[in-house]
């Protein structure tokens, strides 16, 4: 079996890792960075991913997509999506099936399709490093992701050409990265994960027996719509309000200006983790009849903390719930691990330290731990690593809607997965021959207050008085946290099954189409890369040849020069086209036409070298200046 890579598909940044020599290694991307911005931009005929996409975001805000993870597996009408619609520079639209999709260059796209672009870059980064094709991956998701969001992430992997071997929770992956090589023995750790768009807390027990470590997740909690992007937005809103007060201008109607403010806010937030204050200076942010307007605002760390303090404090309640669900107290926690870039904020560290009564460990890289843990899980699945066992949990309860519109739970939250559990239900009316099984995920008592995952009908039930038929409903959750449900009439043995998939909003046909499109685009991308490479080689030979023509001077016969110029002209025309073979052929033609030229240049170089040994030493520049000065009379009046 080939290498199974680990991918942290983040809201703001993504990261890829692989096990090398028994140790998880972060792989640098083509730009030489260890993390890649989860940003995708669509320009005329080209898709940019990562840093290149981020660099052009100011001039192309409507077609530059970021924080797509906040939309993955969500419905358009969701409260969180409606909030994002108001603040995102790109267009969020309602798909035919009611899901939240995005629109760029007039094309409507599903979030898994866009996330697949980031995953493709991660896949290529790993392939370039390993020198072999990669097909298997472990992808991480926030622990509090529901079934729809997990399935959508899995679909994104498929579209990217990856076989997703396992979906693993981010805090669990971070615990792997911390605990696999730790010599501490048995311990209970709290993983506080505040990333770009999501927040999770997981309580994890690490047991070691005869050198084999078991990682058991005791409980998990969180908020799938809270993270660094929200912190950025608080600062953006403050800056826009301040500018309006100072200049009387509302920047919210100017997408280009807002993108500049967003970039500056993100940068300022990062700077304020190490500095007490910073200046946000954006010249020419807008203009009116009186001239250009500049944004120049000083931000202190205290001001930023006052803007976001309520959000940081809101993460403490999930900590209390997670401890309660694990039946533990703060005193039972041996170590605290911080994961996610937003945990670099001093206020976050301060509140977490106060809550747990101990400082978080500093030996875990918050940006890289999750990908490294995913790579370790990949090595476990491939058989490369055998001394580790992971016991993860389902983050939310699962059940069905029963009489009166109530959620009746079949699998409780924080149940170790994989798991299979059954309950027996009956009919609500006399002579009822069919029942609808409505599957729900959540913690609320009222069925409609929970996430609907799907429904199916069980027909052919033997007619009898209400409460007599026995219908066994079985919930089977796999290791990825994806659900399979079956219902059987115990009397007639009539059975119906459903796998809760397509919760991502994509049918099997749509996913297949996107997979095929991605493969076709991969071929187009490869051709584009080859054409660019051929153009670069052509530019290089044109530059060299022009330089050699100058060096040869009159020594180059006129007919030879004409021949070379004609070849250069043909090459210039070829580089304007998209045919790699023609560009390469014309490049070769220039090289062949320049053979005589190269001989002349070489002869001149050799002659100069030989002559240099016999000729007296050349005057230095200083000597030249002295001699020239003898012929120059500079009058005092002429001096300026």
UniProtKB/Swiss-Prot annotation:
Residues 602-640 are annotated as: Disordered. Pfam families: HSP70. Signal peptide: none annotated. GO terms for molecular function: ATP binding; ATP-dependent protein folding chaperone; unfolded protein binding. Keywords: ATP-binding, Chaperone, Nucleotide-binding, Phosphoprotein, Stress response. The modification Phosphothreonine is found at residue 198. CDD domains: ASKHA_NBD_HSP70_DnaK-like. Induction: By stress conditions e.g. heat shock. HAMAP family: DnaK (MF_00332). Acts as a chaperone. Belongs to the heat shock protein 70 family. This is Chaperone protein DnaK. The lineage of its organism: Bacteria, Pseudomonadati, Pseudomonadota, Gammaproteobacteria, Alteromonadales. The gene is dnaK.
